[in-house]
Amino acid sequence: MPDRIALVIPVRSFEHGKTRLADAFTPDQRSRLARAMAEIVVAPRVDADTIVVCNDESIAHWARSRAAQVVTTDATGLNPSLLASRESILRSTDADWIVVAHADLPLATDIVGAVAAAIAARPSGHDCVFVATDRRRDGTNVLALSRANFARWEFAYGPNSLSAHTDQAGRLGIRVIEIDHASLAVDIDTHDDVHLVRDFVAGVLPDWTPADPT
């Protein structure tokens, strides 16, 4: 029987997201863009439990409308939020694997499928953690941990998180396996990221005028 997966997506208020793009998008456009990306990741699914971690009631309401479970926390920031909500997440699912994914992955239409394939192909007899990094090989867009490892993991999101998570796995004696999947490598944080998926952005924001790339 395949291992059961729970997909955990921390989601911040759409109105407060993507501030690094403030010179290219209006606040309303940034909010709509953040929501559109989150709706790709937080999609109704039967192949995994979907759990949204948030500290905003409007996000909680939105997540429930997407058939997701909701874990609320008073913590702010990605690492504190995951740490504070860890026990609630574990109580809300009996999944064998907990997969933490960012909410700003516009191409990630099948995170669960990509992770499940990697888990199924893992070498026997090894304790493994699975990571999908960004195109700069700096961040951790997707992090898949066994239930036991999720319970003890020290989340290190932020600059150089891939290196930090890889180092932690080494200290714990866990083998790191990278999920090399193009759909998981694109997140939208910078103007270069926007240019990579400008057709997606233009479809979401018909009132947006792209800057001249030159």
Task: Give the ranges of each region predicted by the language model.
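N-terminal nucleotide-binding beta1-loop-alpha1 segment
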Residues: M1-L21
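A short, N-terminal amphipathic alpha-helix
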Residues: R32-D49
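Acidic donor-binding segment of Leloir-type glycosyltransferases
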Residues: D49-V70
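Short phosphate-binding loop-to-helix
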Residues: R64-I98
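The conserved acidic donor/metal-binding loop of glycosyltransferases
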Residues: H102-P106
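Conserved donor-nucleotide/metal-binding helix-loop-beta segment in metal-dependent transferases, i.e.
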Residues: A108-R137
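Short, glycine-/small-residue-rich phosphate/pyrophosphate-handling segment
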Residues: A144-Q168
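Conserved alpha/beta core of the MobA/IspD/sugar-nucleotide pyrophosphorylase nucleotidyltransferase superfamily
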Residues: N160, D167-T214
